[in-house]
């Protein structure tokens, strides 16, 4: 069964109810890139980079940057870094060791979907564009400084 979700901020694959790590495989197009043992992974847009991804240690990305950021959630590793991919590439996320149908996929935190080790989550740039109305002009770097750096 194939379902399509659209999100503005992030797509998350995470462990379910059990307090155990999951093994997640990340592919970019057909190429294996990263295997991580963690509570899960966050794939964020630049808009979502200042939310869950940042809280998990991911970078803050300028909204003009056309990319995805993959950040692991509580990885079982002393050395772990986020990876930035161009949004022109499709990413594939698969939970390797979940046979209990206990992992969860969410897009922007909406309607959690249970997934298992046979499920491959494909993440790609949506053909839809979000059009936002600005009440006043903003400067990303000034807002970043005020909200995050000066806290």
Model-identified regions with their sequence ranges:
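AMP-binding/adenylate-forming core of the ANL superfamily
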Residues: 40-44
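Catalytic phosphate-donor-binding core of small-molecule kinases
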Residues: 1-39, 50-151
């Amino acid at each position: 069964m194939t379902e399509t979700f659209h999100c503005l901020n992030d797509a998350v694959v995470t462990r379910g109810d059990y307090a155990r790590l999951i093994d997640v495989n990340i592919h970019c197009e057909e190429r294996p890139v990263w295997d991580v043992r963690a509570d899960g992974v966050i794939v964020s847009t630049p808009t979502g980079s200042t939310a869950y991804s940042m809280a998990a240690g991911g970078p803050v990305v300028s909204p003009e940057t056309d990319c995805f950021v993959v950040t692991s959630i509580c990885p079982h590793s002393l050395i772990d870094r986020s990876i930035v991919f161009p949004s022109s590439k499709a990413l594939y996320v698969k939970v390797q060791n979940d046979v209990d149908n206990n992992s969860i996929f969410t897009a922007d935190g909406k309607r959690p979907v249970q997934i298992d080790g046979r499920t491959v989550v494909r993440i790609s740039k949506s053909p839809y564009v979000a059009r936002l109305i600005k009440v006043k002009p903003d400067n990303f770097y000034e807002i970043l400084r005020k909200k995050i750096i000066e806290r």
